[in-house]
Each structure stands twice: as structure tokens, then as C-alpha cells.
């Protein structure tokens, strides 16, 4: 009875974690090392951050293909293909149809064997998923080659690791680490790209709120690595590997699997028409990946909200 009476006046007011407990959960090695994904998670939902990164809770692996697995598959494939071109001192625009077909086949074969102990070849449905995924992989490579052929920018680096330190008010240091999927250069101009599976956008409101900070952090990391250079940020963009990559629940009657809409990109670009044309000579046209439009006199359309000045 006394417990029930206490329940009447109970107030579920969350308290801050004791400092020692917080250190044990989030600084097991004595240092706080984080990523922008983690910090974005905290800004979005502190409780989710606590469960995911403090208690290390995760969904039970039931041995099934998840959308995250498919995204990692495509991401790893693009990195390996790009690295192959880099070793050969070639750009994306230099890849032939035969390169895309043969190199992607080799990469896909190796990746599928590593995915959950070869689950992509475990049954007919999974094998259809694999073939559909491989097709999406080839289509994405073709898309990236096409863009590169329209661009004067060259790929400078892939999976570029970075870290920097931020001083906290209590005197300790917060280390931010991460990897930049890809950045391209032309003279002193840089374009930073982050590969995403599915549609992802970063509004200015989300950036100000700390919910979408990856692209800006990548730019900061590149600038800090080249302090002697006056880099010109031409573009900060997400490249969509697929609009809707999902596992195939059952083999369709016609044998075709509709995985995605046309690959494209979103983000922010510098409001410089000539620079944008060097990033994509079709900038402003319907088939361009740059989110801008031009007026008849060649200036940027006022409705091009994704085009910002350098000061912005």
C-alpha cells in the first residue's frame, strides 16, 4: 500500500548522470573520442545517444539482410573502385564500360562473400537481391563517371581520415574523428562529397540546430590540414547511391527488381556561375546534379536556395 501511495506523487524527472558514471560510459580509455554522427545523434535524441553509445545497445542480429548492410555494400564497393582508379592514376571519367563491368564484378564477388557469411548466396531470394544490388552498383558507377566527364574537377582523395581536438570548458579535450568519403579539387577550389543510401538533405535550420554537421565538419577538417592555402569551397554535397535500396522479399514474376529512382545529389554550392560550370558543365539543366538554376543572362536564379556566397 505504501508503495502505491508513493506512486501517486512520483515524478519521472531525469537527472544528469554522475560525472564518474558518465566518464565510465563515454570515456572508457580516459579520452572522449567522438564523431559527427554521434554528436548529431545526441542533438537529435540524448536518450538514444545514451542507449546506443553509453550502454552499447543494438538490435539482435537475426542473420537477415538489413538496409544498412546494403548501404555498406555499395559504400565499400565505390571506395574500392575509386581506389583502383587512383592506383592506376586515372579519374572516374577515364573508366570504360569494360572497366565498370569487370572491376565491379570482381569487387562485388569479394564483398558478397564477406557479407554475413555469404548470406547473399544462401537462397534464391537473396541471390536476386545480390543481382539487383550489383546492378545498382554498376548504375552508380556509370552515373559518377558521367558526372566526372562533365566536370573539370579531379578526385583528390577517398576515405580521407581526419581528427581534430576541441578544448572543453573543464580543461579536457574532445577529439572529433571521421572519414571524408571523397573530395575533388580544381586549382584552389574543393568539392566535398558524402555517399548516402537514400534521400538525405541538410537544411540550414538543421545545420544551425546541430542536427546535420557532417559536411561542414569535413570542410573544416580539410581546411585545417591545409592552413597555408586559401581553399575555395565549391560544393558540399551528398551523393545518393540509390533512392530506395531495400532487400527483395520475394522474386518478382518478371524477374526484374525495381530498386531505386535515378541517382542524384543534394547539398550546397558556391554562388559562382563559372565555378559551377567547371564542376558540372550542365549545371542549371534538368539532368545536372547541382541544385541550381540559371537565368537567361547566365546569372543564378533567385530560387537557387542551395547556392550560397562564400561568407554564408
Features from the language model and the residues they span:
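Structural signature of nuclease core domains in nucleic-acid processing machines
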Residues: 1-312
Amino acid at each position: 500500500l505504501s508503495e502505491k501511495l508513493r506512486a501517486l506523487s512520483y515524478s519521472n524527472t531525469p537527472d544528469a548522470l554522475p560525472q564518474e558514471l558518465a566518464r565510465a560510459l563515454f570515456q572508457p580509455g580516459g579520452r572522449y573520442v567522438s564523431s559527427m554522427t554521434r554528436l548529431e545523434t545526441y542533438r537529435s535524441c540524448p536518450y538514444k545517444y545514451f542507449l546506443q553509445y553509453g550502454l552499447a545497445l543494438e538490435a539482435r542480429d537475426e542473420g537477415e539482410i538489413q538496409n544498412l548492410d546494403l548501404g555498406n555494400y555499395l559504400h565499400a564497393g565505390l571506395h574500392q573502385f575509386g581506389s583502383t582508379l587512383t592506383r592506376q592514376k586515372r579519374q572516374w571519367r577515364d573508366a570504360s564500360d569494360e572497366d565498370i563491368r569487370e572491376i565491379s564484378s570482381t569487387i562485388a564477388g569479394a564483398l558478397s562473400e564477406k557479407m554475413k557469411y555469404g548470406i547473399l548466396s544462401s537462397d534464391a531470394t537473396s541471390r536476386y537481391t545480390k543481382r539487383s544490388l550489383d546492378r545498382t552498383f554498376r548504375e552508380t558507377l556509370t552515373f559518377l563517371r558521367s558526372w566526372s566527364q562533365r566536370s573539370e574537377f579531379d578526385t583528390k582523395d577517398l576515405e580521407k581520415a581526419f581528427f581534430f581536438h576541441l578544448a572543453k570548458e573543464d580543461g579536457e579535450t574532445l577529439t572529433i574523428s571521421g572519414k571524408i568519403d571523397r573530395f575533388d579539387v580544381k586549382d584552389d577550389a574543393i568539392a566535398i562529397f558524402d555517399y548516402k543510401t537514400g534521400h538525405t538533405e541538410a537544411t540550414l535550420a538543421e545545420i544551425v540546430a546541430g542536427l546535420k554537421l557532417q559536411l561542414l565538419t569535413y570542410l573544416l577538417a580539410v581546411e585545417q590540414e591545409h592552413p597555408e592555402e586559401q581553399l575555395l569551397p565549391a560544393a558540399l554535397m551528398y551523393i545518393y547511391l540509390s533512392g530506395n535500396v531495400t532487400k527483395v522479399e520475394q522474386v518478382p514474376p518478371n524477374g526484374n527488381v525495381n530498386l531505386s529512382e535515378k541517382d542524384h545529389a543534394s547539398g550546397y554550392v558556391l554562388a559562382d556561375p563559372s565555378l559551377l560550370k567547371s564542376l558540372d558543365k550542365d549545371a542549371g539543366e534538368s539532368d545536372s546534379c547541382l541544385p541550381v538554376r540559371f537565368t537567361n543572362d547566365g546569372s543564378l536564379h533567385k530560387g537557387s536556395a542551395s547556392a550560397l556566397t562564400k561568407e554564408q
